[in-house]
């Protein structure tokens, strides 16, 4: 299943095949999120904390980087938990996916 699948093709797959596709999409999304997180932390914290590039980090720069990364991760986790809770609430109120692909909850 290396080719692109449209919604109609996905609907024709067996439940096991649908689960494989969904699992693959979830894994790719998780990987992309992790890569974005690392990139964002690196860019934001480096720009904020390292004022003068050199061969080593000053003590204050190390502390700043640690605090920056900690705050960034706390914020990321809070947003992720809030979004996950909202998604679960919307799915529960709409009765789940409701009949197939492309009919998930709206985030408006």
UniProtKB/Swiss-Prot annotation:
It is found in: Mitochondrion inner membrane. InterPro entries: Tim10-like, Tim10-like_dom_sf. GO terms for cellular component: mitochondrial inner membrane; mitochondrial intermembrane space protein transporter complex. Pfam families: zf-Tim10_DDP (PF02953). Residues 95-108 have a biased composition (Gly residues). It comes from the Eukaryota. A motif (Twin CX3C motif) lies at residues 45-68. The keyword ATP-binding does not apply. The keyword Membrane applies. It is a peripheral membrane protein. Keywords: Chaperone, Disulfide bond, Membrane, Metal-binding, Mitochondrion, Mitochondrion inner membrane, Protein transport, Translocation, Transport, Zinc. Its main location: mitochondrion. One of its GO terms (molecular function) is metal ion binding. Residues 89-108 are annotated as: Disordered. Disulfide bonds join 45-68, 49-64. One of its GO terms (biological process) is protein insertion into mitochondrial inner membrane. Mitochondrial intermembrane chaperone that participates in the import and insertion of some multi-pass transmembrane proteins into the mitochondrial inner membrane. Also required for the transfer of beta-barrel precursors from the TOM complex to the sorting and assembly machinery (SAM complex) of the outer membrane. Acts as a chaperone-like protein that protects the hydrophobic precursors from aggregation and guide them through the mitochondrial intermembrane space. Heterohexamer; composed of 3 copies of tim-8/ddp-1 and 3 copies of tin-13/tim-13, named soluble 70 kDa complex. Associates with the TIM22 complex, whose core is composed of tim-22. Belongs to the small Tim family. The twin CX3C motif contains 4 conserved Cys residues that form 2 disulfide bonds in the mitochondrial intermembrane space. However, during the transit of tin-13/tim-13 from cytoplasm into mitochondrion, the Cys residues probably coordinate zinc, thereby preventing folding and allowing its transfer across mitochondrial outer membrane. This is Mitochondrial import inner membrane translocase subunit tim-13. The lineage of its organism: Eukaryota, Metazoa, Ecdysozoa, Nematoda, Chromadorea.
């Amino acid at each position: 299943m290396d080719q692109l699948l449209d919604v109609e093709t996905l609907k024709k797959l067996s439940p096991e095949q649908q689960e494989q596709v969904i699992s693959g999409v979830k894994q790719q999304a998780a990987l992309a999120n992790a890569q974005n997180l690392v990139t964002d932390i690196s860019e934001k914290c480096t720009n904020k904390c390292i004022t003068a590039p050199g061969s080593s980090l000053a003590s204050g720069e190390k502390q700043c980087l640690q605090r920056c990364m900690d705050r960034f991760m706390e914020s990321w986790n809070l947003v992720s938990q809030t979004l996950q809770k909202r998604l679960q609430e919307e799915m529960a109120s709409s009765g789940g996916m409701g009949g197939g692909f492309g009919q998930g909850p709206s985030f408006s």
